[in-house]
Every structure is written in structure tokens, then in C-alpha cells.
Amino acid sequence: MFNSGRVRRNGFQDSQMDTIQQRLAQAAEARTFEKEGDVRLVGAMNLTDEQAKKLPFALYRNGFFYYFRTHAHPNSTFLYTQSSLMDLMNWDVDDRMAMIHQPLLMIAGDVSDTRYMTDDAFKKATGTKDKELYLVKGAQHIETYWVPKYVNEEAAKLQEFFGKYLKK
């Protein structure tokens, strides 16, 4: 799972906690510029393949090649307005996990550097007793999207889980 609000707010693996106020100030400033017609866009990774291979987190290394090279949509820019960071930082997938009262299956790669977000959300899903965290052995986050052996394993798990809990 990828909690985009948490990452926009705290940085990946909570690595930018000390710059939250600075980034909010930049978003507020961007909103002022938008009033004058100057929209500031952020988000694209202008990297060479060699630079991408050196990124510190597997999510970003794998994500660069998946989203920018092998599976990129021709119309995607990967950009968003800097002012929207205020809203993006405010949203958090974990906030209402306790309200889930239906069967819940969460799937994550067991070696994924995003797993901390899945683990945190799963712990907060206290509204259902029918829940399971399924770990895909050897998988990183992005690999769970497209690597056939992982996708097939996930599809089988989805069939098993929802076959058990969904009424026919």
C-alpha cells in the first residue's frame, strides 16, 4: 500500500518530517502565484537511467522504470500543481481504517520498502475481525503490479479470500 498523503506530508519512510512547514509555505506561495495566472507544477523526475538506478529507495528506483519507461502512458506528465500539496498532505488513508467493517485483504511484498505503510494501516483496521495481511515473498512494491509470478499469486489469493467472504 502507498499512503500518498503520508508520503507527501512526512516524506518517504517519514524522512522529511523537519521540512513539513517549509513545504506548506511553498504550497501557499504557489497559491498566491496562481492567483496571478502563474501555475507552478512539481513532481516529474528528470533523471537518466543511471541516476535512477542510484536512487536510495527501491520504490523510487523500480517506480522510475515502471512509470517513466516500461508502462508510461503517452499522455501522462506525472505533474501536479504545487499548491495542491496542501490538500495532498492533509489526506491520509490511515485516518478511517477503523471504520472498515467488511472483510479486508491487504497485500504487500514482504521485502517492500513501502510495507511500513501497509502494516500501520492494517493495525488500524480494528472494525473487522475478518482481515488478513498477505505477504508476497520476495516482492517489492512495484513488482506486485506486473511481475507475472507475483500477479498470479495475488490473483489466486484474491479469489480464495473473496470466495470465502462474498456471498454468491
Can you say where each PLM-predicted feature lies in the sequence?
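Active-site nucleophile elbow and catalytic-triad environment of alpha/beta-hydrolase enzymes
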Residues: 9, 14-15, 78-96, 102
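Catalytic histidine neighborhood in serine/cysteine hydrolases
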Residues: 126-142
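Conserved alpha/beta-hydrolase "acid-adjacent" motif
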Residues: 89, 108-119
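Short beta-strand/loop motif that positions the catalytic acidic residue
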Residues: 100, 106-108
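Alpha/beta-hydrolase-fold enzymes
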Residues: 1-68
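C-terminal alpha-helix
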Residues: 157-168
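Catalytic histidine-centered segment of alpha/beta-hydrolase-like enzymes
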Residues: 139-152
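Short, conserved loop/helix-junction motifs that constitute active-site signature segments
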Residues: 97-101, 124-128
